[in-house]
């Protein structure tokens, strides 16, 4: 499963580099109802705790969290579009908690000419997200170690087949994807 402590620390490290030297930095965590879990709540709490401890004199962080009801098609796209159209509500830093939100935010940054006005930390990686990181439209992304998930899944299946149950909790690591390492996440023919 997702290690909320490590993931929270990874997000905090990325957000810390985006804080204004003086004054308030607004940071919004954006997730969808399909991606919102207990783990994402724990990640948010971890980031809040760490940012509070790390901020320097004169810095403050306005941390908010919003969960888009994604029960109908295009709900996420509509919410993100509305957020960018009413740009007085735009945060300084937008933290995307899933791949769909990340890709919607990327498209909205371009469509509404907000590239550079909002710093974005994405989640996971797709060709679209990797291209956005290479173009410096998205600052970075946090991704789970998919190889490790595969190995742990096989281990749990082996344990289940041999013992009739599996009761281990497998904590999966994550990686921070930046412009410097996007090539590591592309398939061989894309490099």
PLM regions: where:
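Hydrophobic alpha-helical segments within soluble ligand-binding/sensing domains
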Residues: 1-27, 74-77, 125-129, 144-162
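Short, solvent-exposed amphipathic alpha-helices that sit
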Residues: 7-11, 38-61, 75, 79, ...
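Hydrophobic alpha-helical
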Residues: 47, 62-131
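Hinge/cleft segment of the Venus flytrap/periplasmic-binding protein
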Residues: 145-191
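Structured segments of extracytoplasmic/periplasmic soluble domains
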Residues: 14-22, 50-57, 82-86, 108-112, ...
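Loop/turn elements at helix/coil->beta-strand transitions in domains of secreted/extracellular proteins
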Residues: 22-26, 54-63, 89-93, 115-119, ...
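Short beta-strand segments enriched in small/hydrophobic residues
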Residues: 25-38
């Amino acid at each position: 499963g997702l290690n909320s402590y490590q993931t929270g620390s990874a997000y905090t490290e990325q957000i810390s580099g985006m804080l204004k030297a003086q004054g308030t930095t607004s940071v919004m965590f954006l997730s969808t109802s399909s991606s919102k879990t207990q783990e994402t709540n724990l990640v948010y709490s971890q980031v809040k705790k760490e940012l509070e401890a790390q901020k320097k004199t004169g810095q403050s962080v306005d941390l908010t969290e919003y969960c888009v009801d994604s029960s109908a098609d295009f709900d996420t796209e509509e919410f993100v579009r509305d957020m960018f159209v009413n740009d007085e509500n735009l945060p300084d830093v937008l933290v995307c908690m899933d791949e769909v939100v990340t890709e919607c935010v990327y498209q909205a940054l371009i469509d509404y000419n907000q590239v550079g006005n909002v710093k974005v930390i994405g989640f996971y990686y797709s060709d679209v997200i990797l291209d956005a990181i290479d173009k410096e439209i998205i600052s970075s992304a946090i991704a789970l170690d998919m190889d490790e998930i595969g190995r742990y899944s096989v281990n749990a299946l082996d344990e289940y087949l041999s013992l009739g149950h599996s009761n281990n909790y497998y904590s999966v690591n994550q990686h921070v994807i930046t412009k410097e390492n996007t090539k590591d996440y592309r398939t061989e023919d894309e490099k």
